[in-house]
Amino acid sequence: PIVRELTTEQESSVYKKMEQIRTGMGAEVSRLKPEDATDICVETVEEGGESDERRERMRRDEVVLVLDYPDRKNCFQDVKIYARAGESVTVWTVVRSKKDAEGKAVLRTLLQAEENAKIRLVQVDLLGDRMQLFNDIGVESGKQAQIEVVQLFLGAEKIWAGSYATLTGEKSHLQLDVGYYREKQQLLDMNYVAQHIGKKTESNMNVGGVLQDASKKVFRGTIDFPLGCVGAKGDEMEDVLILGEDAINQTVPLILCAEDDVEGNHGASIGRPADEVLFYLASRGLSEEDACNLLARAKLEALCNRIGEQKIAEQAENWLWEVTGDET
């Protein structure tokens, strides 16, 4: 793919059109964007007639974006990912700051995949625990397009996350996997929507994580089947491990259905570790705190293994070990 940094005035018609893609946090987020903002635009390129440099860049189907947010500043970043018909691209986005930094980090990511295109987006949050993160995603898919989104929320004091996937093209597919670790009085508030417009479209949303101490998590997951999306299928699964006595978990699943020939499913596994599991780990010499930390790591390391980029995966795993303490 080609990576460009464009001001609003320099954007092509494709990127300007992408501004109309609906996102999970709504139009209010776009109002936070400064007029002189610089967008990061990732696009696949057409074959034929390119320069040697352009052909060489075409061989790269992976892009790593590391966004460092400064202390005591509020920053907005737009990332736009465009995959032409039949092309594929993987983008890793790491948001990070110094441990003691404070401020607001706003990240909006817009994805558009044309017919038979594939986009894989991996987002890893490594912000300091005094930061606030607004993470917004909008997706639009063409016929038989495939979208995969992997998110891992480990840092920041408060996180508001939204995603809205408009599955327009017939047989297009969305795979969304979210993992999180919340401790102390940290907050994670999520609003995720999969709207099935095209026939035989599919969506899978899997959200799972750990709540320690007095942390709070809210998950609103919506699968929308409007009239005409014949044969569409949407699945939504949540898996929450509650380790804190004062932790608060709120789950608000919603399936909207105006079409008869569709299939929508919601499942949830929410609760504390079973006594027999804690007893077994205690028999192996682990205290209850160490046992809970072990379970927390095990839950999220599986998602770390799916990051697919070694350095980023190592950073996420090191962060996870730091917040859960050393294994004994």
Where are these regions (language model features)?
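Short, Gly/Pro- and small/polar-rich lid/capping loops
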Residues: P1-T23
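Conserved beta-strand/loop scaffold segments within soluble protein domains that form the structured core
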Residues: E5, I21-F279, S283-L286, I307, ...
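Extended amphipathic alpha-helical segments enriched in small hydrophobics
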Residues: Y280-A302
